[in-house]
Amino acid sequence: MQMAETEQWMKDFYEKRGWTEYGPFIRIGFLMEEAGELARAVRAYEIGRDRPDEKDATQAERRQELIEEMGDVLGNLAILADKYGITLEDAMKAHQEKLIKRFETK
């Protein structure tokens, strides 16, 4: 799927469940929750968890968790962006332009 198609699918999915009704302050909380889960997945992938109460995951399972948590972050970010009429493509283009302008050699 292309990014625009993915964003539309996420928006439709979230709308069907009433999840788009949450305001931006609640949505940013969900985004931060998912960012924390991504941080935990990165840690597990890089150095492991060392938790006797958890099953030790394979590197492939850890990689899959990274992918899923990145998707959760992007999903929440896309829904938040949509509240302001912004697409992820818009945000990435603005980010690219900002970096080029900031770091271009003169």
Spans of model-derived segments:
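Flexible "arm" and connector segments at domain edges
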Residues: M1-M70, L74-K106
